[in-house]
Amino acid sequence: MTTGAPTTDPLTTPEPETGMTTDLSTDHSRAQADAAHSHGRGGVPEASRAARLASFDLADFPVPTGREEEWRFAPVDRLAPVLDAAGEGLTGSGTLVTVVNPPEVTVEIVGRDDARLGTAGRPGDRAAAAAWASFRESTVVTIGREAVASEPVSIRVEGVPGNGDPSAVHLLVHARELSEAIVVIDHVGPAVLGETIEVVAEDGAHLTVVSIQDWDGGALHAASHRVRLGRDAHVRHVVVTLGGEVVRITPDVEFTGEGAEFEGVGLYFADAGQHLEHRLFVDHAVPSCRSRVAYKGALQGAGAHAVWVGDVLIRAIAEGTDTYELNRNLVLTDGARADSVPNLEIETGVIEGAGHASATGRFDDEQLFYLRARGIPEEDARRLVVRGFFAELIQQIGVPAVEERLIAAIEVELERTMSALATVTPAAEVPAEVAP
């Protein structure tokens, strides 16, 4: 894809047909394919991702210790409030949910006994089960059969200042047959939140769901996104994570009808002390479906930590599957770390294609030297590299207002980078002449 951005991505583009995992980092990243997983019951490894425990019952999930596969990168002590480690439930009232919807879309507030809730799948870990067990009411957004939303649906999940008790929020986005809509979910303010977002796309529906995590510093957020696609449905699922102290997003995607397509797009920027974690599971459970997942992140500052885990399962029945997942991380300063783990499990040889790639690299000093040698100031050169790194994915979001906001947020992050470098790093020397 041609984006018009400068060719300044410091990481080599992996070849999709190889499915190899590339690690370009030194001590800041680990990229590996794991053949076993742990669902928390005594740390017993599973032979298949399909064997992972999924249950609506919180008692089925012990409080994690950090030794479990599912939690090995997470700061479980800091996440304790949203894991309901005390067994008291996430009963606070620290968040408000507001919705602005076009006339083609209906919004309801329903009790937890509504039959539509839980249809997108079951919780897959302790945080998801705690959020499910604790919510009292759900906000249900429905796009009617064959309806086309005239403008994006805006959902705002806002933390209430001064209310630090852990709370739970439940949202359901339901796209009926042959409908089309864009839904933007914005998370802002202070919060200690366990969240469930269910996305149901019925046959032939086309749905874009954008979840933006732009919390205040100190926020704790664990969110389970459960996505179910019917026959010929298309879902573009976008995750943008910028704010919060600890944010952990776990999208689970299930295909239930042939011909469906899922696009997963993720962008994140971790600053000093932040832990931003994204764990995906794409379950190809029926034939002839397609999935594409691409996440990119940048990190800067001491203690900045980004985690990406992408699990793809192609079941024996899912012949004709076409899947590919990619994760890239750009480490801008010392003291930051990115962990990237792509996993691909294939139970049938009759597929269209399957592959994954992971790359993590430091800021390329040679490339910076090259740009500066051609008269580009260091600050501008660094901006060009980072803008080029994110440009293609930003254009894939498909929501201009979100794209503009993200570009502005990246500029703010780059200002922080420049300020930090100005205080600790002397300017690099540039030769007076460079041979053509």
For the regions a language model picked out, list residue spans one by one.
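Conserved beta-strand/loop scaffold segments within soluble protein domains that form the structured core
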Residues: D9, L24, G118-I376, V386, ...
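Residue-level "edge-of-site" marker
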Residues: W71, L384-V385
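N-terminal amphipathic, basic helical "cap/leader" segment at the start of enzyme domains
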Residues: T2-W132, E137, V148, Y295, ...
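Generic hydrophobic-segment detector
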Residues: R49, D60-P62, Y324, D365, ...
